[in-house]
Structures are given as C-alpha cells and as structure tokens.
Amino acid sequence: MAEEFVQQRLANNKVTIFVKFTCPFCRNALDILNKFSFKRGAYEIVDIKEFKPENELRDYFEQITGGRTVPRIFFGKTSIGGYSDMLEIDNMDALGDILSSIGVLRTC
C-alpha cells in the first residue's frame, strides 16, 4: 500500500516533496522550493500523515531512496534525497537550473 501511495504521487515533470509539517527540516525545504515559481500541477506537497501506518511509508522510502526521514524530495520519479541534499544543490546555485531543465518552472 505504501508503494501505491507514493507512486501515485510521482510523475515526470513534477516535483513532489513528502513532509511532516511539524518537522523543521521539512519547513526549511519548503522555504527553498517556495523561492521558485512552478507551473500549475508541477509541484506537490504530500503530508505523510495522510498515510497510516507511517512506519510502513518510511520503510518504503528507505527501500527506494536509502532514507526513512522526511522531507523526501523527488524530481520526477528520481529521489534527490532530503533537505541537506537539496540545500547542497541550492548552495551551488544549481537548483534553479535543474528545475528549469525538467520543465517545472514558469517561464514568464
């Protein structure tokens, strides 16, 4: 069931971030992504509280990404990891270029 829950939310040309809103790392990751202007439908925030039991979901994250923690961030169906991974990309000034290359940003 966790696999279906996650896979239904992942799509090409979309950024998906799985969060827990009480998590400070999740809020920080959302702050980074909120600097960008996404096309409609190209960015989805998924609260992991929507899935029970949460441990099953975290087990599936570990299986497909190597990590159980949130945030879990996907560009298309590819995991880029968590907050520290995205922060590193952002600090290299590469995040905007990556998001542009996958076609999720507004161009105007």
Curated annotation (Swiss-Prot):
Q: Where in the cell is it found?
A: Virion
Give me the segments passing through the membrane.
none
| GO CC list | virion component
What the record says about the induction of its expression is: Expressed in the intermediate phase of the viral replicative cycle.
Disulphide bridges in this chain? 23-26
Q: Which keywords does this chain's UniProt record carry?
A: Disulfide bond, Electron transport, Redox-active center, Transport, Virion
Q: Which molecular function GO terms apply here?
A: glutathione disulfide oxidoreductase activity
What's the domain of life for this entry? Answer: Viruses
Where do the Glutaredoxin domain residues begin and end? Answer: 3-106
Among SUPFAM superfamilies, the record links this protein to:
Thioredoxin-like
Q: Which residues form a coiled coil?
A: none
- Cross-referenced PROSITE patterns: GLUTAREDOXIN_1, GLUTAREDOXIN_2
InterPro entries, alphabetized: GLR_AS, GLRX1, Glutaredoxin, Glutaredoxin_euk/vir, Glutaredoxin_subgr, Thioredoxin-like_sf
Tell me its family: Belongs to the glutaredoxin family.
Q: What does this protein do?
A: Has thioltransferase and dehydroascorbate reductase activities.
What's the protein called, per UniProt?
Glutaredoxin-1
Origin species, per record, is Camelpox virus (strain CMS)
